[in-house]
């Protein structure tokens, strides 16, 4: 198979870099300008609240041992590699799936960086309605969630019998 990288889904990796840059940049800004635990209202339903999360998305498994840092790091690496392979095997015209994979890769790498460098994931977006608060999250989590939603949407929108990696 003699394909150039630009003819594959890997040409969408720029989107992973955008998600990664926005994630790391926003976290650096929060760590520089906020005290841990400090909360600042942004708009009526969002605060920026600097938090450390030793668990996974939405603080899943945050309150146990310490092994989850390494387990979630390994999972992030495996997911990123699997999605890179899928992007390589995919045609560049499979825009929705490649964009979704790239966003998930960018988010996974952003949270992986935090786990490796800080030992925890830096979270700061606090969405709330009244007194009910969603678990604090970050830009990487947003990228991962949007990517997952795009994959589900693609599953509903794809013509029957055609896969994302098939060439048009």
Curated annotation (Swiss-Prot):
Protein family per UniProt: Belongs to the peptidase A8 family.
A GO BP annotation: proteolysis
Reaction it catalyzes: Release of signal peptides from bacterial membrane prolipoproteins. Hydrolyzes -Xaa-Yaa-Zaa-|-(S,diacylglyceryl)Cys-, in which Xaa is hydrophobic (preferably Leu), and Yaa (Ala or Ser) and Zaa (Gly or Ala) have small, neutral side chains
Top EC class of this enzyme: hydrolase
Positions of the catalytic residues: 123, 141
Gene Ontology cellular-component annotations: plasma membrane
Gene giving rise to this polypeptide: lspA
Main location: membrane
Protein name from the UniProt record: Lipoprotein signal peptidase
Organism placement in taxonomy: Bacteria, Pseudomonadati, Pseudomonadota, Gammaproteobacteria, Enterobacterales
Alphabetized UniProt keyword annotations: Aspartyl protease, Cell inner membrane, Cell membrane, Hydrolase, Membrane, Protease, Transmembrane, Transmembrane helix
EC number annotated for this UniProt entry: 3.4.23.36
Pfam families hit by this protein: Peptidase_A8 (PF01252)
Source taxon at top rank: Bacteria
Topology in the lipid bilayer: Multi-pass membrane protein
Function field: This protein specifically catalyzes the removal of signal peptides from prolipoproteins.
Pathway(s) annotated for this protein in UniProt: Protein modification; lipoprotein biosynthesis (signal peptide cleavage)
């Amino acid at each position: 198979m003699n394909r150039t990288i630009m003819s594959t889904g890997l040409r969408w990796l720029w989107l992973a870099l955008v998600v990664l840059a926005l994630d790391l940049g926003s976290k650096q800004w929060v760590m520089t300008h906020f005290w841990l635990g400090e909360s600042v209202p942004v708009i009526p339903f969002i605060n920026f609240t600097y938090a450390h999360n030793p668990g996974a998305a939405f603080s899943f498994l945050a309150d146990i041992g310490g092994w989850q840092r390494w387990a979630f790091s390994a999972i992030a690496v495996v997911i990123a590699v699997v999605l890179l392979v899928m992007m390589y095997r995919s045609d560049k015209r499979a825009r929705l799936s490649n964009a979704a994979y790239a966003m998930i890769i960018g988010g996974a790498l952003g949270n992986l960086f935090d786990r490796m460098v800080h030992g925890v994931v830096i979270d700061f977006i606090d969405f709330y309605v009244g007194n009910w608060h969603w678990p604090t999250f970050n830009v990487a989590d947003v990228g991962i969630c949007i990517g997952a939603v795009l994959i589900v949407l693609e599953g509903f929108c794809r013509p029957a019998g055609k896969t994302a990696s098939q060439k048009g």
